[in-house]
């Protein structure tokens, strides 16, 4: 029983280290209302130059939602505008530029640049973007100093989403309890109620442990027997 608990503890530590190593990194942007988010996502030029790229938002307990995507095949430096989102794909530099103009508080959230390749899973580019938009100060001379609400005027080349709705073929299970609801917080709890059913210790290891214990007990018994025997010898 004690060995099972020890193996369970070691397994828990291993899983925790594995989760920490594979945790997706995030880059945080803190902006005010009316400002512009400007993100540049690098990609492998030889592999993804003409691939369709997309800008997605990730909400807790839901699959990523595509907000805008480039044409297919993606055209070099051709701006695509969907609402307040502008995408520009620079093939020469292997760079996707994403701008969200006239930011609002409700735009706060977690975003990502991806290679959009249905029915395959999207391939994520760059780090995920944690956007935090706060209220600006109105009525002051510098309130609109950094605002780019009316700066980017793109010709009406593309004003609708070009990517069809795509649902991942994976089965989406119900969102886990609150401890795993926040995307930015890694899981720290592991259910080990059925550890005995999950962890199977190799038989060879058990034999080695039992043999070692048996030999240790035999050695102690032999020493005690020798000491006792000498005490009775005149």
UniProtKB/Swiss-Prot annotation:
Disulphide-bridged cysteine pairs: 41-113
Keywords: Adaptive immunity, Cell membrane, Disulfide bond, Glycoprotein, Immunity, Immunoglobulin domain, Innate immunity, Membrane, Receptor, Secreted, Signal, Transmembrane, Transmembrane helix
Record has Disulfide bond as a keyword: yes
Domain Ig-like V-type: from-to ranges: 26-134
SMART domains, per the entry: IG
PTM comment: Glycosylated.
GO MF annotation terms: receptor decoy activity; scaffold protein binding; signaling receptor activity; transmembrane signaling receptor activity
InterPro entries, A to Z: Ig-like_dom_sf (IPR036179), Ig-like_fold (IPR013783), Ig_sub (IPR003599), Ig_V-set (IPR013106)
Extent of the signal sequence: 1-20
Stretches assigned to the Cytoplasmic side: 227-234
Presence of the UniProt keyword S-adenosyl-L-methionine in the record: no
GO cellular component, one term: plasma membrane
Transmembrane spans: 206-226
GO biological process terms on file: adaptive immune response; humoral immune response; immune response; innate immune response; intracellular signal transduction; neutrophil chemotaxis; neutrophil-mediated killing of gram-negative bacterium
Glycan attachment sites: 146, 191, 194
SUPFAM superfamilies to which the protein is assigned, alphabetical: Immunoglobulin
CDD domains referenced in this protein's UniProt entry, alphabetically: IgV_pIgR_like (cd05716)
Phenotype for residue 97 to S: In a breast cancer sample; somatic mutation
Tissue specificity note: Mostly expressed by immune cells of the myeloid lineage, such as monocytes, macrophages, neutrophils and dendritic cells. Expression is associated with a mature stage of myeloid development. Highly expressed in adult liver, lung and spleen than in corresponding fetal tissue. Also expressed in the lymph node, placenta, spinal cord and heart tissues. Isoform 2 was detected in the lung, liver and mature monocytes.
Membrane topology, Extracellular segments: 21-205
Induction cue: Up-regulated by bacteria, fungi and bacterial lipopolysaccharides (LPS).
Stored Pfam families: V-set
Oligomer and partners: Monomer. Homomultimer; when activated. Interacts with TYROBP/DAP12. Interacts with TLR4.
The protein, known as: Triggering receptor expressed on myeloid cells 1
Name of encoding gene: TREM1
């Amino acid at each position: 029983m004690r060995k099972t608990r020890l193996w369970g503890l070691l397994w828990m530590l291993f899983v925790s280290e594995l989760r920490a190593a594979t945790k997706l990194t995030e880059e945080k942007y803190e902006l005010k209302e009316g400002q512009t988010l400007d993100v540049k996502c690098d990609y492998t030029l030889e592999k993804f130059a003409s691939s369709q790229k997309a800008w997605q938002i990730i909400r807790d307990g839901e699959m990523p939602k595509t907000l805008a995507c480039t044409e297919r095949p993606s055209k070099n430096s051709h701006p695509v505008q969907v609402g307040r989102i502008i995408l520009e794909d620079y093939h020469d530099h292997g760079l996707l530029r994403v701008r969200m103009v006239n930011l609002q508080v409700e735009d706060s959230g977690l975003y990502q640049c991806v290679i959009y390749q249905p029915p395959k899973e999207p391939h994520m580019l760059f780090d995920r973007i944690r956007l935090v938009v706060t209220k600006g100060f109105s009525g002051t001379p510098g309130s609109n100093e950094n605002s780019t609400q009316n700066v980017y005027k793109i010709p009406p080349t593309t004003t609708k989403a070009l990517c069809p709705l795509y649902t991942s073929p994976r089965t989406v299970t119900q969102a886990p309890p609150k401890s795993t609801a926040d995307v930015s917080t890694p899981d720290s709890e592991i259910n080990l109620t059925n550890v005995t059913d999950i962890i199977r210790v190799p038989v060879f290891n058990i034999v080695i442990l039992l043999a070692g214990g048996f030999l240790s007990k035999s050695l102690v018994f032999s020493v005690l027997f020798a000491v006792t025997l000498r005490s009775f010898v005149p």
